Structures are given as C-alpha cells and as structure tokens.
Regions:
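Conserved Class I S-adenosyl-L-methionine
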Residues: 3, 17-18, 46-48, 165-254
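Class I SAM-dependent methyltransferase Rossmann-like catalytic core
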Residues: 4-16
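Conserved alpha-helix/loop element of class I SAM-dependent methyltransferases that forms part
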Residues: 16-35, 52
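Class I SAM-dependent methyltransferase SAM/SAH-binding core
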Residues: 38-92
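A short acidic, Gly/Pro-enriched loop at the edge of an enzyme's catalytic core
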Residues: 90-101
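A short SAM/SAH-binding and catalytic strip from SAM-dependent methyltransferases
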Residues: 100-114, 137
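Conserved catalytic/acceptor-binding region of the Class I
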Residues: 115-116, 122, 126, 130-197, ...
C-alpha cells in the first residue's frame, strides 16, 4: 500500500473524512469507557482517533501505535502527553490485559494479517474490555473514494480497486472479529458528510499519492490522468460537492 508519504499528505487526503468519523467511532467504541480507564489506538495515523480519545479520557490515559514513522511522529506532536510508539497491529508491544479499549479506525483493511491484528488487540485488552474497528464500505460503493474508483473501472475495467480488501464488504468485518476469538460481536455503520467547495478541491487530494487510489493515479501517464479527471468530473454533482461516506463498524469483547 502507498503510505510512504508525509503525514501532512495523508491528513490532507483522508483527514477530511477521518476527523469527523473519529467522534462517531469513539461514541461506539468508548461506550462504557470513562475516567480511570485506558485506551489504545491501533494504527493511529497522524492521530485523529488518538486526539478524540485524549479529549474524552485525558491524554495520559491514551496509548497509540502506528507502523509509519512519520505518522507516529505526527500523532505524538498532536498529543504530546499521550504515549505514541511505532508498531504494527500484529505485534503490539504491550503485555496482556492492560487496556480497557483497543480501537482501530480505518486500519483493519490494510493489516497484513487482519485476524492476527484483531487477536493481538484482544490480547492486550483486559477481560470484559472492548475491541472496536471500522473500515470504509468500499465494496458497497459507499466509501469516500467510491466516485474515483467508479470512474477508474469505467475507463480501466481490469484495474484493482479497494473493494477486495478485508472487512470492506457487508458482514466481513464482524466475521473477522469472530475468527479472532472476540465475543459478543456487534456490527453497525457510521456515516459522515464532507463538503468540497469545488471539483478542483476534491481532485487535488488524489494527486498527493496516498493509498491505493493515489498509487493508481500516479501510475498513469498525463493523458490517462486527464481522462480520469474528466470522468470523475462527469460522475460528481455540481459545486459544492458533498460526499457521504459510510464505514462498517464492529465491536467485540474479550
């Protein structure tokens, strides 16, 4: 996956959606979690969910891990009183049973081993604690990048999009929770609405080279990029452009 980019590029590309998603996800994941309890943000990126958890629990009660060094540094700058380290979900650097909540916002579909990553989240969560995750509904065409990938498929039917990633189709995220041994799994959806003042504002973020969408665009020559841009323009409404993005979400208990 193309996440060898700056934290600023990632925040510009996905932060417009992950920032409003974080409070909704925290409401779901953190129900029943309060003062005196500890939370872990897995795959924290530049820190959208980390900051939301810190706002609710206090930064001293929040830990975060992120495999990208630049993203981890950005999260640490954003929440300097929280503990932020560099680690992958599949190999969490914590003993068993230390957190009341382990949450992964927009991460599971990019894990090398999603079941293993969720199992690790369960391992570090105390008995009766909560494990939570959410991923965009890429397979159902309700993700924040769905218009882009629809345009891609219309021009290049053989292109790989994000619809085959783990957890992005109906029921699959909850299935991964069950396979990871988490009990009491419940599934729902979370939806955010993001307004772009113009098509140019919407399109510019894709040129930053972030994630599979950015990598695909970067792989095209100038003529094919221009054709894709115009195809996207035809698919999107007139300015301003409002994108509704829906994520699958699941919770389970250890």
């Amino acid at each position: 996956m193309s996440f060898a980019v700056s934290a600023e590029a990632y925040a510009a590309f996905m932060g417009r959606f992950s920032e409003p998603l974080a409070p909704l996800f925290a409401d779901l994941a953190g129900a029943g979690i309060g003062a005196g309890q500890r939370a872990l943000d897995v795959g924290c990126g530049p820190g959208a969910m980390t900051a939301e958890l810190a706002r609710r629990l206090g930064p001293a009660a929040v830990w975060a891990v992120e495999p990208s060094e630049s993203f981890a540094r950005a999260a640490a700058r954003r929440e300097p009183a929280a503990w932020v380290g560099q680690a992958a979900a599949e190999h969490l650097p914590f003993p068993d049973d230390v957190f009341d909540l382990a949450a992964a916002q927009l991460v599971v579909h990019f894990m090398t081993d999603p079941v293993g990553g969720l199992r690790e989240m369960g391992r570090v969560t105390r008995p009766g604690g909560v494990v939570a995750a959410c991923v965009w509904d890429h397979a159902g065409g309700r993700g924040p990048l769905s218009a882009f990938w629809r345009a891609v498929r219309e021009l290049d039917p053989a292109a790989d999009d994000e619809s085959g990633l783990p957890g992005v189709r109906a029921g699959h995220l909850a299935e991964l929770f069950v396979r990871a041994g988490l009990g009491g799994t419940e599934a729902t959806t979370l939806t955010v609405h993001v307004r772009h003042a113009s098509f140019e504002e919407w399109w510019e973020r894709f040129t930053l080279g972030v994630g599979p969408a950015g990598a695909y665009l970067a792989s095209l020559d100038a003529d094919h990029q221009a054709a894709l841009r115009e195809q996207c323009r035809r698919l999107l409404p007139a300015n301003p452009i409002e994108i509704s993005a829906t994520a699958w979400a699941a919770t389970g208990r250890t």
